[in-house]
Amino acid sequence: MKILISTDAWHPQVNGVVRTLTSLARSASALEADIAFLTPDGFPSMALPTYPGLRIALPNRREIARRIEAAAPDAIHIATEGPVGWAVRAYCRRRKLAFTTSYTTRFPEYIEVRTRLPASVGYAVLRHFHAASSMVMVATDSLRQELGARGFRKLGFWTRGVDTDLFNPNNPVTLDLPLQIFMTMGRVAVEKK
C-alpha cells in the first residue's frame, strides 16, 4: 500500500510531529508500507507571526495537485492543519477522495497564548478541518475524550511508543547517583504548560 502523508512540520524543525514522521519513515518497510511525504520543501514560505524562527509554507494549488498525482497514493493522511494540510484537504475534497487526519498540537491554546484570540475560535476552525476526515488520529485516550467533548467526531488512535533501539532494559544507563532520578524532557515555549 502506498500512503502519502502531508505535513507542514518537517526538517529542520525539531518537534514531536517531525520526530514521529521520521520514525515512521524508518519503520515503513517493517510495516509493509510505501510511505511518501508531501512536505513544505520547495514552497515559498514566511515567518510565523509571533514565532519568527518558524516558517510556514505558502503552497500553490497546482503544485499540491502535481505532487499528489506523482505520488499516486492508495491512501492520504494529513498530519498537520497548516497551509499544506489545508491545501491537501481541499484537493481531496474537490476530487471526493477519502483521507485521514491527525490532531497532535493544541493550536487553539497556542494561538490564544500568543495572540489572545479565544481558543474557542481555534477549536471551531479545527472541528471544521477535521470533520471531512474519515478518521481523526489522536495519540492518547485523554486527548480523544477532550476532543470528543469539544464536538470532534470519528476519533481513533495512532499511539506513539518508545524507541526500543534507544531505550531498553538490555542497555541501561548507569549513573553513580545516591538515589533514582526520573526526568522528562520537552520543548520549552510560552504555550507549553
Regions found by a protein language model. Name each.
Residues M1-F43, A71:
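N-terminal subdomain of nucleotide-sugar transferases
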Residues I3, A75, A90-Y110, M137:
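Active-site proximal beta-strand in glycosyltransferases
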Residues S6, V173-K192:
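Conserved donor-binding/catalytic core segment of Leloir-type glycosyltransferases
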Residues G16, K192-K193:
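Active-site helix-initiating loop/hinge in glycosyltransferases
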Residues P40-A71, I78, P118:
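A short, charged, and often flexible helix/loop element on the N-terminal side
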Residues I64-G85, R95-T100:
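Short N-terminal targeting/anchoring amphipathic segment
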Residues A98-T100, F107-H128, V138, T164:
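Nucleotide-sugar donor phosphate/pyrophosphate-binding loop at the beta->alpha transition
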Residues Y123-N170, D176:
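Donor nucleotide-sugar binding/catalytic pocket of nucleotide-sugar-dependent glycosyltransferases
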